[in-house]
């Protein structure tokens, strides 16, 4: 994908494997924006912090971290402590997400007012406003 000739103004969204492997193989390639997704566990937050540090060197635009499945204040505090100074979107654990999946529906269609969908609603503007 990194070798493709992609027209200016084209949005490409890629979902890469977990971890930092893809980021370490970028070489001198710059990307327009990076979203790092993490759970609020110690190991996952550590990897997210390392991924963000590497991604910062390769992005010419925003770097946003999505902390997924946040259950409580302890999770929120762990995210804030580990990722201090980063742009973070906290997405709460939300039964509407697996419910929509079981119904073979997008959460945005099935439960547009659910806490997780509302938390993610501002992500696009964080990515394209720069």
Specify the residue positions occupied by each region the protein language model found.
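C-terminal alpha-helix
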Residues: 119-130
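Conserved catalytic-core segment of NTP-binding enzymes
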Residues: 2-93, 99
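C-terminal boundary of histidine-terminating zinc-finger modules
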Residues: 101-118
């Amino acid at each position: 994908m990194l070798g493709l000739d992609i027209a200016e103004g084209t949005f490409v969204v890629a979902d890469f494997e977990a971890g930092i492997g893809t980021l370490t193989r970028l070489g001198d390639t710059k990307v327009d924006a990076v979203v790092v997704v993490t759970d609020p566990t110690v190991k996952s937050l550590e990897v997210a912090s390392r991924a963000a540090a590497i991604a910062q060197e390769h992005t010419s635009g925003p770097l946003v971290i999505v902390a997924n499945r946040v259950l409580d204040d302890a999770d929120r505090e762990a995210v804030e402590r580990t990722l201090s100074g980063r742009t973070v979107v906290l997405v709460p654990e939300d039964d509407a997400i697996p419910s929509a999946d079981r119904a073979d529906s997008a959460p945005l269609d099935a439960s547009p007012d659910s806490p997780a969908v509302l938390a993610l609603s501002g992500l696009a503007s964080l990515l394209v406003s720069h």
